Swiss-Prot record:
Known role: Involved in nonsense-mediated decay (NMD) of mRNAs containing premature stop codons. Probable component of kinase complex containing nonC and recruited to stalled ribosomes.
UniProt-recorded name of the protein: Nonsense-mediated mRNA decay factor SMG8
Disordered: annotated span: 571-604, 629-653
Organism: Drosophila persimilis
Biased composition (Polar residues): 595-604
Disulfide bonding pattern of the chain: none
UniProt keyword Nucleotidyltransferase, yes or no: no
Bias (Low complexity): 634-653
InterPro entries, alphabetized: SMG8-like (IPR019354)
Acidic residues bias spans: 574-586
Keyword set includes Lyase: no
GO biological process: nuclear-transcribed mRNA catabolic process, nonsense-mediated decay
Pfam families according to UniProt: Smg8_Smg9
């Protein structure tokens, strides 16, 4: 014991001399359990009793430290639990050290709570008095929950197996049927007093009485204490104090702060109230403060307060309840209904040691181990070991119950709002609404797992015959057909309004899902509905014609689809001109040779239904072999001079057209040896077709399965009147004021052939040609051109500038059309129709009214778009000629597709970059002299040299 007045040891290692002293007490040993919270490193809750553990003490969860003061009948049993900060820190460190296991706070909290309940149950059965130590200044309401769990565990688990298991041991005879020494009396010790209140006797007593009333009401309300000892978990004294506030002793003080405080008090001197009569005495003092005391005067102290501080200690507070146990009035002082036979059992030290050893083994040391499961065959005890923690986890059950209710509400909300068939976006929206319905009730740690379960259930409900196909259309609209059920074709439910090829009839078109449906099938269907499309003669574009059933789409390099085509085109150009670098030709011969080569590459086309329209094809020269489109005006002018073989330097306002020599009869040059063979680039494949549209870098020889363009003559030029514009019965759907074509005056100067040639071949000219020749070498061609845009609602309008919609005749100036045809036109433009949605109109048709002159207008549109800068063309090796004095309409593709993927239209156009979605390149028109010697109804058998040349306007 040394300098201390008490003994301390760790259970069950009791020293022999202490055991001898305890044996001398006989059956007058009162066991007091001290349990609760602590903040010190040694987990010591005995500081209020003036006791401390050894210096080398290591706190451990579940460890019991015993204290005994000689001369008393009290054995203090100190419980080290997870409510001690030192023990809790150890458990946190062990949990954090587990590899790969994230820290689960809720699970950790439940484990700590269950371990504390085990220690409380042990104290409940082996102690006469329980002292709960609280470091705070108020009662912890969570302790009521702990008491409820203890009562539940004792009634539902412990009393099912303890009587039978203890019956075979000496502890069973000593403890009786209740398996405990008594209904223990619980006391509450608060280590700290509120600083706001004064520490006088009245203030401390008032605070203690107020806390006692609150605790008593709580424990009575939750039936922790009752009027009968047999049904009560704990006991409270009726007429004795059971709450103690430590108001005077500073427990667990900081040594450094204490030293600073002592130094401050030593340096400070308090003034004593001085009487006027003592001034003469004070004058005799050698210095100021000579007779002043270092503290309060003795007269100022209160003897009663000093006596209260001396007697108001935790030890005296405890001994009053110990005396009740020794005198045999323990139950009488706690309950109104006292049993006939007293339940309080006072044991000697050895008997008590045997009882606690057996109970500690059953409740604490062997709990949860496999050895105890194999050793003890009691079914109730095995259930206790396996499900004790789970049964006490009431919070988990509460959260699980709430999440179960929320899960039902969420699934019900999802199924109630779910339509028969819906897609992923609708599924996500319904799932978000179901989550909101779940969160009305479901919460807590299992909420995340419950939401995942609800998500899986809703997903199965969606996939059980309700899933939408969701195949995206070419306009990015999902298919609304069921995914599991077979359907012939996709349908998004979105309907567009579009016009036919000739523009006379408008029809409702479904959202296209394939290139063929968008650019070919709809317009073929509209031919049957339009009485004008049936009558017009259409230009037949070259398409793929297989020789057998084994044909496939051509494969392209996905990463660089244009690079391979560019390399092939350069290699073919090198094969066509092998001696270009070795030999320099004069300028005239080089131009003549270049024109001959370009004209010799024409591809034969089928006749146009035996049409009597003056429609032919002619070569563009180098424009057919261009690897890159001409974007600037200088490149366009250079190409024009090359194609025509003439110079326009004489006049900036005139277009020079050189009249060609009439071709000789076909019979005069039928020598097979004189016919030059067609270059290899003109050969078309019969096994592979082009999956997309033809563009400038397409692989040579590949043709599409169907034409995506349409060129039709809808009637003579007289059907258009510039005074009235396009009438509704002829072209329906145009917005008011936007139904006019733009007049285009082209000044043309004819350059005749040599005089000998002119005189010898004069009889071959037609009367119309002779009449124009008589009027002079200059003429003005009146052409009408219109760039038509159409939105998905069927609104059509013409443009007068790339950034302006035509608003009537006031917008038409003299040079408006001339500027239009020499400027890039945007492929998409916002529709001026009034709508909440911003509909984009697409360039769909180009209207051309040809003049009454012995010339043919030639069209060669090029549409540039896509991130890879595809430049789409008509696909003909030679562009078509338009007959004189006729109304022609060129219908552009509805959807554009390159070699690898679809080129989707932009969702929105910025006003400062209207060309972002694509544009029609300037310079699509050309002009050539009409040759009456050509048989235009049988163009496939014409020699390529007979097609002649033309001049780009």
């Amino acid at each position: 014991m040394g300098l201390k007045d008490y003994y301390t040891w760790t259970f069950p290692n009791i020293p022999e001399h202490v055991a001898q002293e305890l044996d001398q007490l006989g059956r007058s040993l009162v066991v007091v359990g001290v349990i609760g919270r602590s903040r010190c490193v040694l987990a010591n809750k005995m500081r209020a009793f003036g006791m401390e553990p050894p210096v080398d003490h290591e706190p451990t969860d579940g460890q019991l430290q015993c204290y005994y003061k000689p001369g008393s009948s009290t054995l203090l049993l100190h419980f080290e639990t997870t409510f001690d900060d030192a023990i809790l820190g150890q458990q946190i460190d062990e949990t954090m050290e587990q590899d790969g296991a994230p820290f689960d706070f809720d699970g950790f909290y439940e484990r700590m709570k269950c371990r504390f309940v085990r220690m409380m149950l042990l104290a409940l059965h082996v102690c006469h008095i329980l002292v709960y130590v609280e470091t705070g200044q108020t009662f912890d309401l969570s302790l009521v929950t702990i008491f409820q769990l203890m009562k539940f565990a004792r009634e539902q688990h412990l009393m099912q197996f303890l009587p039978s298991l203890l019956k075979e041991t000496p502890a069973g005879r000593l403890l009786g049927e209740k398996c405990r020494l008594c209904t223990p009396r619980i006391l509450f010790l608060f280590e700290n007093f509120t600083h706001e209140e004064g520490k006088t006797r009245e203030c401390v007593s008032a605070c203690e009485f107020q806390t006692e009333d609150s605790i008593y009401e709580l424990l009575r309300h939750h039936q922790i204490i009752t009027n009968s000892s047999s049904s009560s978990l704990l006991a409270l004294p009726n007429n004795k104090q059971f709450v103690f506030y430590n108001a005077h002793d500073q427990l667990h003080a900081d040594r450094l702060l204490q030293s600073i405080e002592f130094l401050n008090l030593d340096m400070r001197k308090l003034d004593v109230k001085e009487e006027e009569d003592d001034l003469e005495v004070l004058e005799l003092a050698p210095f100021d403060g000579f007779v002043k005391s270092f503290g309060e005067s003795f007269e100022s102290t209160n003897y009663e307060e000093q006596q209260y501080k001396t007697e108001h200690t935790a030890w005296h507070f405890l001994q009053r309840h110990v005396q009740d146990a020794l005198l045999g009035c323990f139950d009488e002082g706690s309950f109104k209904q006292v049993p006939q036979r007293g339940q309080l059992q006072l044991l000697n030290a050895q008997e008590w040691h045997d009882c606690i050893a057996e109970l500690h083994k059953l409740l604490v040391s062997s709990a949860g181990t496999q050895e105890s499961l194999n050793e003890i065959r009691n079914e109730d005890y095995q259930v206790f070991l396996q499900s004790f923690d789970e049964s006490l986890n009431y919070e988990k059950k509460f959260w699980a119950h709430l999440c179960e209710i929320g899960l039902k509400m969420g699934i019900e909300a999802y199924k109630k709002a779910a339509p028969a068939i819906y897609g992923s976006s609708m599924h996500q929206q319904l799932l978000a609404e179901a989550t909101l319905a779940f969160e009305e009730e479901g919460r807590g740690p299992p909420a995340e797992a419950s939401i995942a379960k609800m998500t899986a259930t809703c997903l199965r409900h969606w996939q059980d015959g309700r899933q939408q196909c969701e195949q995206l259309s070419l306009r990015s609209q999902p298919c609304t057909q069921p995914k599991e059920m077979p359907h012939d074709k996709h349908n998004s439910g979105v309907i567009h309004v579009s016009s036919c090829n000739c523009g006379r009839t408008q029809g409702r078109r479904e959202d296209p899902f394939s290139l063929r449906q968008a650019n070919y099938e709809f317009y073929e269907h509209m031919v049957k509905m339009c009485n004008l499309c049936v009558k017009v003669k259409q230009f037949k574009f070259p398409i793929f014609e297989p020789t057998n059933n084994e044909y496939r789409a051509a494969a392209f390099e996905v990463a660089f689809p244009l690079l391979h085509a560019g390399k092939n085109r350069l290699a073919q150009d090198a094969e066509l001109d092998p001696d270009e670098e070795d030999e320099e030709l004069p300028t005239g011969e080089r131009e003549e040779q270049h024109i001959t080569q370009s004209n010799g590459c024409s591809q034969p086309l089928s006749p146009t239904f035996g049409s009597d329209l003056n429609m032919s094809i002619a070569g563009f020269g180098v424009s057919l072999n261009e690897s890159e489109p001409c974007f600037d005006q200088s490149s366009s002018s250079e190409a024009e001079s090359t194609c025509s073989g003439t110079s326009s330097e004489e006049s900036n306002n005139e277009l020079v057209l050189q009249l060609k020599e009439p071709a000789k009869k076909h019979e005069e040059s039928c020598d097979p040896d004189s016919i030059a063979p067609l270059p290899s680039m003109c050969l078309t494949s019969t096994t592979e077709y082009l999956p997309g549209l033809v563009h400038t870098l397409s692989k040579v020889g590949l043709l599409p399965l169907f034409p995506s363009w349409s060129l039709a003559c809808v009637g003579p030029s007289s059907i258009y009147s510039h005074n009235t514009g396009l009438q509704e019965h002829f072209q329906s759907g145009f917005l008011s004021g936007a139904n006019f074509l733009l007049p285009w005056d082209v000044q043309l100067r004819l350059v005749h052939a040599s005089k000998h040639y002119h005189n010898s071949h004069q009889p071959h000219m037609s009367k119309k040609q002779q009449r124009y020749r008589k009027h002079g070498d200059r003429m003005v061609l009146k052409i009408f051109v219109g760039f038509e845009y159409e939105c998905s609602r069927g609104h059509r309008f013409m443009m007068c500038r790339p950034d302006r919609v035509l608003r009537g005749g006031a917008d038409i100036e003299r040079d408006t059309c001339s500027k239009m045809v020499h400027t890039n036109m945007p492929l998409y433009y916002p529709c001026p129709c009034r709508s909440q949605n911003n509909y984009l109109a697409q360039l769909m048709r180009i209207h051309v009214v040809t003049p009454k002159a012995p010339v043919n207008i030639i069209v060669d549109p090029k549409v540039c778009m896509g991130k890879d800068k595809y430049t789409f063309t008509l696909g003909s090796m030679v562009p078509p000629r338009l007959s004189q004095s006729a109304y022609w309409i060129l219908r552009l593709p509805y959807v554009y597709q390159g070699d690898d993927a679809l080129i989707a239209p932009p969702e929105k156009l910025e006003p400062d970059d209207i060309m972002a979605g694509g544009y029609l390149l300037a310079g699509m028109f050309g002009i050539a002299e009409t040759d009456p010697t050509l048989d235009l109804n049988d163009q496939g058998h014409l020699d390529t040299n007979e097609l002649g040349t033309f001049t780009r306007i």
